[in-house]
Amino acid sequence: MAKLTIALMDSPYESGTTTTAMRIVDAAVRKGHSVNVFAYEGAVSLTMKEQKGHPNPVKGTTIEEAKHPTTANFVAGLLATGKVEWINCGMCVDERGSGDWIEGPRRGGPGDLLKWSEESDNTLIMGTR
């Protein structure tokens, strides 16, 4: 099977880019591939432990009824497959104070992205705009 590296830069809930990336990772894992995710800039907040769901006022549902998935929940599910590795850029974490993560991601730097890119069959960089 192939190994894919994806670099993400968007903060949670800023655009559809993050959702698209998560769906790509999920699809690759379901096909048996391994995926490395390097979170850079605002994407280091995707794994923040204290994210909360919210009610859906359009549908009139409560927090419990809405079952709004957080990016941290989504990432945790991907990591649980054993086919995904996740690195948060340490400089970006420090700049944003985004250090309280779910279990699984590790701290790294741009050199890790380079190493993963060299070892991967394909690399996808998903910028902010």
Regions found by a protein language model. Give the residues of each.
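Extreme N-terminal starter segment of soluble prokaryotic enzymes
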Residues: 1-5
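Short, glycine-rich nucleotide/cofactor-binding loops
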Residues: 6-19, 35, 41, 47
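Short, basic, glycine/proline-bearing loop/turn elements
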Residues: 8-11, 56-63, 94-100
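Histidine-anchored nucleotide/phosphate-binding helix
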Residues: 18-31, 37
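Anion (oxyanion) recognition and catalysis
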Residues: 29-30, 79-80, 117-118
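N-terminal beta-loop-helix "entrance" segment that forms/cooperates
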Residues: 43-56
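A glycine-rich helix N-cap at a beta->alpha junction
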Residues: 55-88
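N-terminal glycine-rich phosphate/adenylate-binding segment common to multiple enzyme folds
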Residues: 84-129
